[in-house]
Structures are given as C-alpha cells and as structure tokens.
Amino acid sequence: MSLELLSKLETKIQATLETIELLKMELEEEKQKTSALNEQNQQLSEQNQQLQQELASWNDKVTGLVGLLNSEI
C-alpha cells in the first residue's frame, strides 16, 4: 500500500512539474508578445506625434494663405 501511494504521489508530482514547465513557456511567450507590443506602441506614439506636428504646420500654412487672401480682397 505504501509503495502504491508513493507511486501515485510521484505521478502527481511529475504531472505538476510538467504543468509548471508548460506555464513557464507560456509566460515567456507572453513576455515576448508584450515586449513586441510595447515596441509597436512606442513607434505608433512617435508616428502620431510626428503627424500631429505636420498637421499643425499645414494648419499654420493654410491660416497664413487665408489671411493673405482676405487682405487682398
């Protein structure tokens, strides 16, 4: 009986260790995905800032041109 219990315990421990290893691998994959998403987020934030600056520049140019048209009318 004692050997049977030890065998069952060993089986459960082995299954638990395998589960832990799988979870570690999944965690590593999620960390890599998170890192890639953070990098993509940073790039998109920089692109957004650049586009906002370009939009502001164009708005200034259009405002200047409208001002010139109004002064000539």
From Swiss-Prot:
Keyword Cytoplasm: yes
A GO BP annotation: division septum assembly
Transmembrane segments: none
Gene Ontology cellular component terms for the protein in this record: cytoplasm
InterPro entries according to UniProt: Cell_div_ZapB
Pfam hit, one: ZapB
UniProt keyword annotations, A-Z: Cell cycle, Cell division, Coiled coil, Cytoplasm, Septation
Coiled-coil ranges (or none): 3-67
Superkingdom, natural source: Bacteria
Compartments it resides in: Cytoplasm
Subunit-level organization: Homodimer. The ends of the coiled-coil dimer bind to each other, forming polymers. Interacts with FtsZ.
Task of the protein: Non-essential, abundant cell division factor that is required for proper Z-ring formation. It is recruited early to the divisome by direct interaction with FtsZ, stimulating Z-ring assembly and thereby promoting cell division earlier in the cell cycle. Its recruitment to the Z-ring requires functional FtsA or ZipA.
Family affiliation: Belongs to the ZapB family.
Protein name: Cell division protein ZapB
Organism: Shewanella sp. (strain ANA-3)
Species classification: Bacteria, Pseudomonadati, Pseudomonadota, Gammaproteobacteria, Alteromonadales
